């Protein structure tokens, strides 16, 4: 089955170029030119990837991303201006999985999309390999990709789940940010290690009673992160 991608940008020439290139690779591409249209399409369809510009009419990309995260963990890649680090951080804070800076090379876009799709597909366990992982108060159902804390479900994005699953599967093992970037985002992922910090912070906000004094995901200062259990 062809992968389905939603491309959102108010610059029609950019959308046209991305659409043509992705369709050449056998993907099915839908297009939206403003935030409200994008949110409507994301609500009514499932996409394997959403390419989402930040500067959009009617509703900006941050708000669109935030709304999508209320009901879906579809992978979202934000299109940001070159050198605008704040936009990159905000995009990740609002739930984006990755970002690509403009102007970009279409080959980079295609490579990034394929890398994330491979990672997302690889994180979906087969039924015969499904399992439930328990660590203290946490229970991860790896088949349905659902997290429960004290039997109460906590909604995670795809990357948040992948990150937590890796740490819980390796209790008390410290991973550097570079290792986590490689293992969770893929070895070909060319992103910034700050991506890891933002996802850890978001994860703590969801699973920790007091994120500033974490019970589960700990920091080994100067080294990296680990899931603590006695």
Residue ranges and their predicted role:
Residues 13-24:
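Charged docking surfaces used in two-component/phosphorelay signaling
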Residues 26-33, 41:
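Short hydrophobic/Thr-rich beta-strand motif most characteristic of the beta2 strand and flanking loop
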Residues 9, 53, 80:
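Active-site residues of response regulator receiver
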Residues 46-51, 56:
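Active-site beta3 strand of CheY-like receiver
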Residues 130-132, 155, 200, 204-230:
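DNA-binding patch around the recognition helix
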Residues 32-36, 88:
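Conserved Asp/Asn-Gly motif in the active-site loop of CheY-like receiver
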Residues 58-60, 66, 70, 75-134:
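Basic, amphipathic DNA-recognition helix from helix-turn-helix-like DNA-binding domains
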Residues 4, 115-174, 178:
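Short, Lys/Arg-enriched segments at the junction into DNA-binding effector domains
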